């Protein structure tokens, strides 16, 4: 589907970061930003009924769901793939450069970024139906390069963490974005299930510590760090809520040669190590299964020569124990782990897709072929898809 939303900015660009192999699109200069802002509310009000009509309203935001399509960005467009047939389709194919698609937690909508043609560091945020139809621009003013774009559990708003460390809440119904807090970084899927009443984050001025706050930015509280734990605990990677919102998983750096996965209760109590594997290991990026009974994570093992070697993704019961290797080992930098909505498989992409740097037309960026790993038998299936961004797996009603 072609994105056709009028704006005043010319569509020419040198593109960098976030996605790969973007191509610029040139179109005429049309009315100035003042006019766009004046007409913004009218545009959203007119488009919102069509967008809302696409909501199923039956898919829970957390827990197991039926598998839908997988979305990603490449060449400045948004693609979707069917994990059963392997077929791919262009969902949003211009004009302009679009990137970083994220399905809403109820699976009915898709959020994505559109680069401002005259300023490669700024983006408009759009929301469409899951099939790419009825796209609506939900930001009247472009935002600086986002570090995170996340849906709230009710699928009615987006949390945007910009490059300056500010968090804004943008309603998809057209109200102005509201500043929640600044100088912070959201954790992946930061909203606490089931209602998003709290947010997980890190502070710019307190590296290695983990915090939680109310969704409006009030009542900040340290969960990991000197003020919260009687240990020299240092957060060493992303932290994530369990699907029921009762626990948090994350990696802690124990020393220069060991990083392990830990779990604690949502209130910060009961901190304990998840895995019991012996030897020198680095474990990172723990990701909960939708069922909440298992956790998958990247891991590296130090060999006899003292070098760190990537190992297959590890899976361990949420109650703790020995990590079982699953599938083929990812690339040396580790995998982006995305559980299927039904919890029966894992989508693995190399982390280089989030580190790509492209300047059109000479840049090559980082393009990956996704691997889907069956949890039951460990079978790994590589799809012949060219993926240039983090992927998003759509949830559908059971």
Name the predicted role of every residue range.
Residues 1-5:
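Short alpha-helical interface segments
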Residues 6-13, 19-20, 27-398:
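Sequence signature of WD/YWTD-type beta-propeller architectures
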């Amino acid at each position: 589907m072609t994105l056709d939303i009028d704006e005043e900015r010319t569509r020419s660009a040198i593109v960098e970061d976030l996605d790969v192999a973007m191509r610029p699109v040139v179109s005429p200069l049309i009315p100035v930003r003042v006019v766009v802002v004046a007409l913004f509310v009218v545009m959203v009000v007119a488009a919102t009924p069509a967008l809302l009509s696409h909501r199923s309203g039956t898919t829970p935001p957390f827990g197991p769901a039926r598998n839908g399509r997988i979305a990603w960005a490449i060449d400045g467009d948004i693609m979707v793939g069917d994990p059963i047939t392997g077929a791919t389709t262009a969902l949003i194919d211009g004009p302009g450069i679009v990137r970083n698609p994220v399905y809403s937690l109820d699976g009915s909508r898709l959020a994505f970024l559109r680069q401002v043609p005259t300023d490669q560091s700024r983006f408009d945020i759009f929301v469409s139906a899951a099939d790419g139809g009825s796209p609506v621009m939900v930001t009247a003013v472009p935002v600086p390069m986002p570090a995170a774009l996340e849906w709230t559990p009710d699928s009615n708003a987006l949390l945007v963490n910009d490059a300056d460390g500010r968090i804004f809440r943008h309603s998809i119904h057209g109200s102005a974005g509201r500043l929640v807090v600044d100088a912070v970084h959201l954790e992946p899927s930061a909203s606490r299930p089931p209602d998003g009443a709290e947010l997980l984050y890190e502070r710019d001025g307190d590296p290695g510590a983990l915090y939680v706050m109310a969704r409006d930015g009030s009542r900040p509280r340290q969960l990991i760090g000197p003020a919260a734990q009687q240990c020299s605990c240092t957060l060493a990677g992303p932290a994530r809520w369990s699907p029921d919102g009762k626990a948090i998983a994350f990696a802690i750096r124990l020393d220069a040669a060991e990083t392990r996965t830990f779990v604690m209760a949502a209130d910060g109590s009961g901190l304990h190590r998840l895995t019991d594997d012996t030897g020198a290991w680095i474990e990172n990026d723990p990701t909960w299964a939708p069922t909440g009974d298992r956790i998958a994570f990247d891991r590296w093992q130090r060999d006899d020569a003292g070098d760190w070697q990537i190992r297959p993704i590890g899976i361990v019961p949420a109650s703790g124990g020995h990590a079982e290797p699953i599938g083929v080992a990812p690339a040396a930098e580790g995998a982006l782990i995305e559980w299927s909505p039904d919890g029966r498989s894992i989508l693995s992409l190399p982390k280089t897709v989030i580190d790509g740097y492209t300047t059109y037309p000479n840049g090559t960026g980082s393009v990956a072929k996704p691997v889907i790993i069956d949890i039951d038998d460990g079978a790994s299936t590589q799809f012949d898809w060219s993926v240039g961004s983090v992927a998003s797996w759509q949830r559908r009603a059971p």
